[in-house]
């Protein structure tokens, strides 16, 4: 029975160590992304808009169109636009 516990302990340790390595890689990547946004900002780009563009590019066209239609409906209801844009 003690061998089974030892194996489980070793497996658990291996999982934890893998997760820790991946978390460190994730932090490094997040720092790299932050640096890229900083470079873009330094060249005059609006990073808030860049982040929106990145988020939009992750979505498929149909999903984007549905979200835009809902947004237009809400803006129209709030009087923030006169009529939904054609398109």
UniProtKB/Swiss-Prot annotation:
Family, similarity comment: Belongs to the UPF0335 family.
Gene Ontology MF term list: DNA binding
Pfam families hit by this protein: GapR_DNA-bd
Record-given protein name: UPF0335 protein RL4065
Coiled-coil spans in chain: none
Domain of life: Bacteria
InterPro entries: GapR-like, GapR-like_DNA-bd
